[in-house]
Amino acid sequence: IQERFNYNCVTQTMEFMSGEDILRLDPISQIDTLYLEGHKMIPYGTRFLEVLYQSSEFSLLIDHKRKMKEDGKIGAMGIKTQNGVQNVDHRSLGIDYRQGWERGVDLYTYEDETSYWLKTRRKMKRFRDVKSLYKILPDKKPMIESYVEEHRTVFSTPDEVLELLKCCM
């Protein structure tokens, strides 16, 4: 099937356009693989993971996730404000969080909660930072420490995490 898909990192769902409607791809259990702009996506539980690297030794997958934080409300004359009492959470009422975009004002900020999955010998282990990587690879801790210090590895950059794992695995 050739469709225009989009992965929603807030809801962790695969979406596509059907006319003017945005539809969610469901059930995902019947899907093997999707390709988005050259990125290989595979179903895992109720969400999709991006396959960044695969080899006989290990695979590195990315769990793209964003947390939506309310940044403010539209006040007088369309200006964003945080003043006043907040009685209603629009999300709890099912109101589309994209409504603010139509007015050119984004009422939300998004916090990155992306994590990685390391697959070795059919076992999947999740990590977000160097401390959680130490826990799943305790025997490689000295090598990881040395590499991270020397290369100043940033865990929010998937390619840097991949290079670290290639060196230490």
Predicted regions and their residues:
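Aromatic-patch recognition
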Residues: 1-125
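Long, compositionally biased interface segments
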Residues: 124-169
